[in-house]
Amino acid sequence: DVVTPLGWVYPRTKDAAPLEAACLAGGATLHGTGIHPGGITERFPLMVSALTAQVTHVRAEEFSDIRTYGAPAVLRDIMLFGATPEVARTSPMVGFLGGGFRQSLEMIGHELGFALDDHVVAEHEVAVATKPIDSPMGPIEPGTVAAQRFTWTATVNGEPVITARVNWLMGEEHLEPAWSFGEEGERFEVEVLGDPP
């Protein structure tokens, strides 16, 4: 049996068929789980959606100080913190994270009855350091990436209905643009809009 935080929270039918056959043949199971995606992103919104008759938009969002992430090599070499904005935009993180988040969006869309468009909109934004910022991988130098925001949006007829977002900041000081965690600090947020609200 396999439990993984790397996707497989809601595999599409075409993706699931070979895995299901292998699991049945081997007497095994595959369970995808996690926090975001894998829990906060889809399970909480589905639970909260029971309080409204007509859901119009769902948002799940993470706000994290990435200085607490204990893998300097991942921060530097994969997530590309400390790189130039141009280099950071080539990071595999949009696609890597997108696999799990797309499954989350599909789960919410299916369970709430949204006829989702085929294309999920993926966005990657960066903020740069304006002064040196201490980090687990060493100083983040001015002009290099010190914060990243990844957003995946599912639409119906081009209108946003489900949004999953991560905000990873090397603290809140010396960033351009001046992103912050807001008054609430680090957190996960879930918002379900509908009628009645």
Stretch-by-stretch model annotation:
Residues S49-L193:
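Active-site-lining helix/loop region of Rossmann-like oxidoreductase modules
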Residues P5-T29:
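Rossmann-fold NAD(P)-binding glycine/threonine-rich loop
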Residues V2-P5, L30-T33, R59-A60:
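General beta-strand structural signal in soluble alpha/beta enzymes
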Residues K14, P18, I35-G39, G95-Q103, ...:
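Conserved active-site and cofactor/substrate-binding residues in soluble primary-metabolism enzymes
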